[in-house]
Amino acid sequence: MNKANMLRTDKDMQIILFSEVSVGISANSILFIAHVCMILGENRPKPIDLYIAFLSLTQLMLLITMGLIAVDMFLSQGIWDSTTCQSLIYLHRLLRGLSLCATCLLNILWTITLSSRSFCSTKFKHKSPHHISGAFIFFCVLYMSFSSHLFISIIATHNLTSENFIYVTQSCSLLPLSYSRTSMFSAPMAIREAFLVSLMALSSGYMVALLWRHKKQAQHLHSTSLSSKASPEQRATRTILLLMSFFVVLYILENAVFYSRIKFKDGSILYCVQIILCHSYATVNPFVFICTEKHIIKFWESKCGRIVNI
């Protein structure tokens, strides 16, 4: 992609991207602060609250990093050096991977928490946070190693004229790699993402089947007219299904745009669309948590009430 074409990119795309980043940073900050305060105020915080707090922190850092990259894409005069380019692009790639990993593990932990109360599952529930934490550390090391090639393939190119370089920002470009090297780095990442998305789909499907069976048992034992209010389990199911469906749709759209960019090699608009889709989940999912978890709303209502009383 030529830098001149990037500068002529539709201004609407720039506004959408900066608006998305700003809204996402605000929403994740609200979610993170609420969960940290609730965790510090409890003697035994729930594992799910810890993972939601970590997910919101990861997404917050991801969007801040993307904001810095977007500034260099549209507003900067190309003043970054190679170290800055490599560090920020590497950090952004790492945070993207950790966000996907944290979302997957949170989905699994949520499924385990809502599973049946058999002896095996109850015993596993107590150990699951430790297993999931170990899995997360493993994926952290894996992501760091998979993204390490960016330190040699990202360079600062302030006066880019060659079409061989791949545009990243006004300051940074990606060195062209051979087909074998590209496959060596892209294949493990594709397998990793497919594995995590498959785990999310399986855990969500299992939980939906589990709660559907629970609902049938409840209808058999009790009259459905006793209460029309949704149970906490049903609300949790709706939340997970909504997040999972939204994630899958964005994942499909993002990959479709990516392959379209490969076909139309000089697509500055497609580049912006891919970036917007890539960060839409990190922007939207905090609102889903805030709207579906009543204790977060009550927390902020109490804080706002105290400020008003003062």
Swiss-Prot record:
The record's GO CC annotations read:
plasma membrane
The answer on whether this UniProt entry bears the keyword RNA-binding reads no
Q: Which residues are glycosylated?
A: N159
Give its localization. Answer: Cell membrane
- A single MF term (Gene Ontology): pheromone receptor activity
Pfam families with a match to the protein in the record? V1R
User: Which parts of the chain does the record assign to the membrane side Cytoplasmic?
Assistant: 42-50, 115-134, 212-238, 290-310
Gene3D superfamilies xref list:
Rhodopsin 7-helix transmembrane proteins
Q: List the disulfide bonds.
A: C85-C172
Extracellular topological intervals: 1-20, 72-93, 156-190, 260-268
Q: InterPro entries this protein is in?
A: GPCR_Rhodpsn_7TM, Vmron_rcpt_1
**Primary location recorded for the protein, binned into one broad class:** membrane
| Biological role stated in the UniProt entry | Putative pheromone receptor implicated in the regulation of social and reproductive behavior.
What is stated as this protein's family in its record? Belongs to the G-protein coupled receptor 1 family.
Q: What is this protein called?
A: Vomeronasal type-1 receptor 40
Q: Which gene encodes it?
A: Vmn1r40
